[in-house]
Amino acid sequence: MQLTVKALKGKEANIQVSEGDTVLAVKRLVEEKLKVPVSQQRLLFRGKALADEHCLAHYSIGPGSRLNLMVKEQVAPEGHSGGNTAWKSLSVILRKHFSPTDAERVLEYVQKDYERSLSLLSLDDIERLATRILHPQYSEATDLGFLD
């Protein structure tokens, strides 16, 4: 089916998709057509933001539907690049070994997995991790559960 994707500031593209395609797959097509990186895209349908993991049928998007594209500007706050340095370094490494699109996909996956892993840490987990970092001489005992 044909969809029209319209950026809020002008550009428009027609793309060929199926109802079973995910929003992320659509974003990749939009990246090819409109040269907007997936990480900067937010797709809307009838005013509702679309989640990457859902398929188009989930939102009742059919032939001839029109999606709106909001482009998120990626501006780093002045004087604060510490957290982004590792991601930028990883991005450079990935781009040496993968196409730009694949490198972006891998980087997004790693970032999401990292955020998910952090959100699962309990206060006890953080305390054990800090103890291992600050007192490496106790790490063997901690690994064996003697300090728990």
Swiss-Prot record:
CDD domains per record: Ubl_UBL4A_like
Principal location: cytoplasm
Claim: Nucleus is one of the keywords in the record: yes
SUPFAM superfamilies the record matches: Ubiquitin-like
Residue ranges of every copy of the Ubiquitin-like domain listed in the record: 1-76
GO term, biological process aspect, one: tail-anchored membrane protein insertion into ER membrane
Compartment annotation: Cytoplasm, Cytosol; Nucleus
Keywords: Cytoplasm, Nucleus, Transport
GO cellular component, one term: cytosol
InterPro entries from the UniProt entry: Ubiquitin-like_dom, Ubiquitin-like_domsf, Ubiquitin_CS, Ubiquitin_dom, Ubl4_C_TUGS, UBL4A-like, Ubl_UBL4A-like
Presence of the UniProt keyword Nucleus in the record: yes
Known role: As part of a cytosolic protein quality control complex, the bag6/bat3 complex, maintains misfolded and hydrophobic patches-containing proteins in a soluble state and participates in their proper delivery to the endoplasmic reticulum or alternatively can promote their sorting to the proteasome where they undergo degradation. The bag6/bat3 complex is involved in the post-translational delivery of tail-anchored/type II transmembrane proteins to the endoplasmic reticulum membrane.
Protein name: Ubiquitin-like protein 4A
Species whose genome carries this gene: Xenopus tropicalis (Western clawed frog)
Lineage: Eukaryota, Metazoa, Chordata, Craniata, Vertebrata
Gene it is expressed from: ubl4a
